[in-house]
Amino acid sequence: QFLKGAEIAYETIINSFAKGDVNSLKPLLTKEMNDNFQSAIKDRRSKNLKSELTFIGIKSSAIEKFEKTTEALFFSVKFVSEIISCKKDKDNNIIEGDPNKIKTVIDRWKFTRKKTSMSPNWYLTEIKSS
C-alpha cells in the first residue's frame, strides 16, 4: 500500500514541478524540500524558461530501505520511469532535453513521516537521481 501511494506522489510531484504548480507540491513535501522546489520554480520563471514534460509511466518501483529514528519513519524508494522532457526559452527554442525522445530516469526518493503524526501522509524529504 505504501509503494502505491509513493508511485502516485512521484508522478504528481514530477508533473507539478514541471508545470510550476506550487499548490500541488506543498502537501507532498517536507518544509525543506518545499523550499528547494519553490526556489527552483522561481529561478526558472525569472529566466523565462518553460519546462515541458510528458510522464510516460513508471517501469518499476521498489522499497530499498526502511529506517526509523526515535521521532520518524523513513522509506527509501527506487523509481525507474520514462519521461519526455525539455526546457525552452522565452522564444520557444529548446535549450535542454528533447521533446521527441523518451528518456529512462532512475530516481531514489526518501519519504518520511513523524511517528507522533495522526496523519497517514508521507512526505518527500530527499531526492537522488542517476
Residue ranges with predicted function:
Residues L49-D89:
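Surface-exposed, charged secondary-structure patches
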Residues T30, E82, T116:
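Residue-level marker of positions within ordered structural domains that often coincide
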